[in-house]
């Protein structure tokens, strides 16, 4: 909770108070009253939230450690997560300030982007009549993070008796877009230096075919990893823009959970990107956890 923020905002609005409240002694008295009520009130509200969670944990035999912090939400959460050794942090994708147009709340976005930890972002809250979702879908691109996601996916599929599906997407179309965008601007001399026609043919005959083989090999390795842990798995290789194809897949048949690495195979060794573009797009747009 953010009692300090309320205190700051109250002081900003003091000049709007009626005249009888603008005397120095009266303003100071009102500040103390406001600070006491807000701090106490927010502590009570936070405690009530934890009481509800505590009851649910007790009913399921789960131990609960209660923690409350005063400060800017995402800042305090990041400090706490980085200071602890949590196996998993679970957050709702939006908070109480959501609107119909909200894709992701500011707290969720900032915490997930700035903490290099495992997160489960809850986006789907099942209703009583909903058909249960039964698939753990893992996206593989060959990066260490994606295979880390696979290990988590295998564990979840076994523990919760879910189907495991792995998906990989390669993009053979990007070079066509790039080549078409430069063909009209290259001078004859530049085209010769660049060996435009040879480069185009190289991509068509070698690189695009090679990409398909590379990503298929990632799927094959992932399949063996699952089978070694006695988990049945289905695998899918698609071509196109990664986030778009994965989004189409989860929109057509939403899984129980989609698991992704924070970053992908194109991350540079010393690059601190926060989240990769595919992960960030799907975090916003996928209709599933």
Q: What kind of feature is each model-predicted range?
A:
Residues 1-33, 58-65, 134-202, 227, ...:
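Small/aliphatic-rich secondary-structure junction motif
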Residues 4-16, 20-89, 204-258:
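Structural beta-alpha unit
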Residues 47, 71, 101-102, 143, ...:
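Short alpha-helix boundary/capping motifs
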Residues 53, 111, 149-152, 156, ...:
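Hydrophobic residues within alpha-helices
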Residues 66, 72-129, 244-289:
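Gly/Ser-rich helix-loop-strand patches that form or flank binding pockets
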Residues 116, 161-162, 230, 287:
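Structural alpha-beta junctions
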Residues 170, 239, 264:
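Active-site-proximal loop/turn and secondary-structure-junction residues that shape catalytic pockets
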